[in-house]
Amino acid sequence: MTEFSKTPLLDTIRTPDDLRKLRIDQVQQVADELRLETIDAVSVTGGHFGAGLGVVELTTAIHYVFDTPRDRLIWDVGHQAYPHKILTGRRDRIRTLRTGGGLSGFTKRTESDHDPFGAGHSSTSISAGLGMAVASDLAGTKNNVIAVIGDGSISAGMAYEAMNNAGAMNSRLIVILNDNNMSIAPPVGAMSAYLSRLYSGKTYRSLREAGKQIGKHLPKLIADRAARAEEYSRGFMMGGGTLFEELGFYYVGPIDGHNLDHLLPILQNVRDADAGPFLIHVVTQKGKGYAPAEAAADKYHAVVKFDIATGTQAKTKSNAPSYQNVFGASLVKEAQKDDKIVGITAAMPSGTGIDIFEKAFPKRTFDVGIAEQHAVTFAAGLATEGFKPFCAIYSTFLQRGYDQIVHDVAIQNLPVRFAIDRAGLVGADGATHAGSFDNAYLGCLPNFVIMAASDEAELVHMVATQVAINDAPSAVRYPRGEGRGVEMPEVGIPLEIGKGRVVRQGNKIALLSFGTRLAECEKAADELATLGLSTTVADARFMKPLDVELVLKLAREHEVLITVEEGSIGGFGSHVMQTLAEHGMLDGEVRMRSLVLPDEFMDHDTPAVMYARAGLDAKGIVKKVFEALGKDKAETVKLA
């Protein structure tokens, strides 16, 4: 029996050039098939799901109307770009998404000419797009630049900085606001679509431009009032465009982002316009076309592998709690005893465990949106008034608020508590989301207390420690995922500041861990013991202030000292070496080595594979020990 393809038109498309050869009445079928393919692919690989389904029609329309990749198409964040990847020559690899050697879960310049700008973090698209548009002007190429940005991303300050700059120029920048939360505009319909098409057309724009020219010859008061009347009438009729008009954009919308009869003519009008910048306001629904995702957008924002028929996700059960949940629960316990504790997150309440705190203390919880800079200084302001703010942010996103950390927190020595989630490698999300650098970029700042939890029980105590620190900013870092399954304390007990602990005593090799690589150090010690190498394993707990007494003792009493951390060069190991150098301990007395992440941006894979490649698993630690000893490992032991 012949098996018929569920995607016959999509099967004919290798590049957007093939799409543009189709009749306009075939575009809807392409979109329908593209949605089916996206659902099927993500059910196999997992990944970001709802956002991609929400832009299927928009993606199809953009590639049909514009001459991509000559016309540049930038996806803000990039997590909604799976349909885009399918249409741009990557369908044959779409079921390798977020796997080792496979396609990235975000846009990536090295992956395709159709990805002119890489992404992962939010709110960068308009700035990058404006740069490309100005470059086109300078080069005389006059190609279009389209930046697609969500209503969450456009709330960030960088987006408004870019729009403010773009509004003062006449470059061919087209911003498409993908509004999937209805946070800006009222419901859309036929009248709105008709008006959008009318206002984006050449006739209306020509009349409007003529009106502007006439206004230049009128008394300023009359001209200003006329312009204001036109602006507000459009804002009233169209629902929400006045802000963008004030920034210098020509606003069109809102329009139904799932109706190609609305999208195609408006995109064509904007494409054929003589100047810019434009902002097209498109309203979409996350998870569109897949009932479980439509019904529970939050649960289907990002998914693991799932059954298409039922929507059931194949989540593995763990006997250990996740670090984010341990943090959230620990903060609740502390806040029950201290009404000065408040929780802050930047649009990541469930990802950081702040949602647990919010359920217990809704009035003491603040989700500031995608605004890390504001989150940090907002926390600083709370600290000046005697409150105890816990600012829970992923390591990779905390980078966005670095000047505020330095200028508003550290210099003023304000006791803001940073809970740094997703520290270290994060796996499938790759380089843009890796928490590789916080050891280095926080460790160089005066006044900070910096901790890393070696397991979930330690995290409980470190949260309690942060509560007790009232005279300095502090940070605790911990990874994504589940803990080790250790016995959990009933309550957190504040740790002695700047003091580590020895978890296993030896006399030949010393392994000093900062963070959750402690478990791999213990495995390495077991293997080294079988080879007759007595090994001490220590948990540093603190990078700053460093336990100098412990570091010097390990260096004096062992032949080899190796530091191990889930961070880049310039972090914990550098602090240890600096200390040893200042005490003359690197003058031939100890063989010191530092295990850190490679000095590169590592591509996505599973965390286990990535750490093994970095030499930060037990096997890599043992190998480093033998390199330090200077012995030929092939003669001493088979490490494979």
From Swiss-Prot:
Cofactor: Mg(2+); thiamine diphosphate
Entry's Gene Ontology BP terms: 1-deoxy-D-xylulose 5-phosphate biosynthetic process; glyceraldehyde-3-phosphate metabolic process; terpenoid biosynthetic process; thiamine biosynthetic process
EC number: 2.2.1.7
Chemical reaction(s) catalysed: D-glyceraldehyde 3-phosphate + pyruvate + H(+) = 1-deoxy-D-xylulose 5-phosphate + CO2
Subunit: Homodimer.
Organism name: Rhodopseudomonas palustris (strain BisA53)
Protein name: 1-deoxy-D-xylulose-5-phosphate synthase
GO MF annotation, one: magnesium ion binding
Cofactor note: Binds 1 Mg(2+) ion per subunit.
Binding-site list for Mg(2+): D151, N180
Keyword match Flavoprotein: no
Pathway(s): Metabolic intermediate biosynthesis; 1-deoxy-D-xylulose 5-phosphate biosynthesis; 1-deoxy-D-xylulose 5-phosphate from D-glyceraldehyde 3-phosphate and pyruvate: step 1/1
